[in-house]
Amino acid sequence: MNKTTKAFLATLIIITTAVGFTALKAQAEPIKPSVVVIDTAIDASLPVFKGRLIQEVCAMEWALCPNGTGFQEGPGSASTIPMNVLKSVSFNHGTQMASIAVSSNAYVNLIFIRIVGMTKDGYRASTTEASVVKALDWVIANKEKYNIASVAMSQGNHDLATYNLLCPKSNLIKYIDTLKSINVPVMLPAGNDYDITRVDYPGCIPQAITVGAVDKFNVINAYSNGNPTQVDFYTPGTVKSILPGGTQTTVAGTSASVQSAAVYWATVKMVKPTLSYDEIYQLLKATSTPTSNSKVKNGSLINIEKATK
């Protein structure tokens, strides 16, 4: 660890964030770690993203990015969408997830990758695995440029007829494995279907890190899919978020849990930069708080305070 890093770490102070967790804020300015949020679209005009949203990307199988192609990078790439559409149920998810991410640690930067297209009629186009592949491929290529620490994608499906074919034979595996080899985890939701027998696709992919939700009492929420053989970590599932246009709301689900888990990983990487992927994973496991409910036992609730000591 060089003198600059030591001096920076010495200036870290503990603060309590808007979502009620402890995070780290810096008074010095080395290269900040970035969390990539892959989702629907983002209201980049919101004050919460000022100085935090450092890159927008659009990556889709279809030619539905704002520039009329299947790829776009730069301001407006993920946010050029009519406000009435952005506020709709089909597209407001991304802004909410990004707001949770930036609220979980005041020091982490945000990169937003849009993978959901809008049809000519203003409806949500289908989201494909190929779009996610393009997004992850961009992350691999830009990991060093933006100091990317983790990826959060709060998208999933529990009712695929091809579920058993996709897990664990998804085309995403190669890209998730590559990111793991460069110390970047891909965090995915367990899903919210009250099903303790399995988690959503693509969270079922073994190479990914699957995140479930606990309630305000740190008990595993009944809606949180899977069990600890399938779910790597748990974090609170009911948190405050911001909708497009700036209205504050409360969101509940494993989608929210994914965002804080990804930021917690980035926080550990920031405080302990020499740790590898496997070392951070084991540290989060070793310092976690046991969690359970009446049907699911031995879950691992991330304890970021212990993990960053």
List the predicted regions and their residue ranges.
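Bacterial N-terminal signal peptides that target proteins for export
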Residues: M1-L9
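Bacterial N-terminal signal peptides
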Residues: A10-V19
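Sec-dependent signal peptide cleavage junction
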Residues: V19-P30
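Extracellular S/T/G-rich loop segment that most often corresponds to the catalytic His/Ser-adjacent loop
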Residues: P33, D39, D200-M270, T274
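Structural recognition of the beta-strand scaffold that forms the well-ordered cores
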Residues: S34-I38, N109-R114, N147-S154, P185-P189, ...
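Substrate-binding/access-modulating region of protease and related hydrolase catalytic domains
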Residues: V116-I205, F217, G246-Q259, N293-V296
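C-terminal subdomain of the subtilisin-like protease fold in secreted/lumenal serine endopeptidases
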Residues: Y146-Q155, S170, I182, Q207, ...
